[in-house]
A protein has these predicted regions:
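Active-site residues of response regulator receiver
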Residues: 8, 55
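Receiver (REC) domain active-site loop signature in two-component systems and cognate sites
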Residues: 58
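Alpha4 helix (beta4-alpha4-beta5 surface) of REC/receiver domains from two-component response regulators
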Residues: 65, 76, 87-102
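Helix N-cap/capping motif at the beta->alpha junctions
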Residues: 33-42, 63-65
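Two-component signal transduction core modules
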Residues: 52, 80, 95, 103-104
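Two-component/phosphorelay signaling modules centered on CheY-like receiver
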Residues: 11-32, 46
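Interdomain helical linkers/hinges and coiled-coil/dimerization scaffolds
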Residues: 96, 102, 108-171
Length: 171
């Protein structure tokens, strides 16, 4: 199950988003609802999520500032979606700058959330596949370089790669 954090200062809208679609049917679990960006940051310091749905205008900390803080401080690599009543291109432009996954205008329609659920699920799968491929490639390089070292054919590249991947004790 992918974990979802809702961030909205209007409880009725947050609840509406949580019941508009059957999140579990699509492989999602809403793990928490925060009333503003600051509450969301506190939650993210101790919990990981895969998707954040946040309003733009909220007291204390708005959605754009939340997104910016998350990205700059590397608090989460969750997919981030802005839910806004503002069609102003300036907000969308700022959101794109900080790698926002999507920008949905209110009132949120059921089909929009369904499409979003499918889109994020596909993006998540692609990211996980890429991560696995990268780990496998790294492991293959490591084995290749270790073999070269064990066979007595060390080169500078092999030594640097292996020493970068291993911790040697200095006793």
């Amino acid at each position: 199950m992918l974990k979802v954090l809702l961030v909205h200062d209007e409880p009725i809208i947050a609840q509406g988003i949580s019941v508009l679609i059957d999140w579990e049917k699509y492989g999602y679990e809403i793990v928490d609802t925060a009333n503003n960006g600051l509450e969301a940051l506190e939650f993210l310091k101790h919990n990981s999520v895969d998707l954040i749905l946040a309003d733009v205008k909220m007291p204390v900390m708005d959605g754009i500032k939340l997104l910016k803080t998350i990205r700059e401080e590397k608090l989460s690599d969750a997919f981030f979606v802005i839910v806004s009543g503002y069609g102003d291109f300036t907000y969308a432009q700022q959101a794109i700058k900080y790698k926002c996954t999507d920008y949905i205008l209110k009132p949120v329609q059921k089909q929009q959330l369904l499409d979003l659920a499918v889109q994020v699920k596909n993006l998540y799968s692609t990211r996980e596949e890429q991560k696995t491929e990268k780990e496998e490639m790294s492991r293959a390089y490591f084995v290749r370089y270790i073999q070269a070292l064990l066979l007595g054919r060390p080169d500078k590249e092999a030594l640097e790669y292996v020493s970068g991947k291993m911790k040697f004790s200095q006793n």
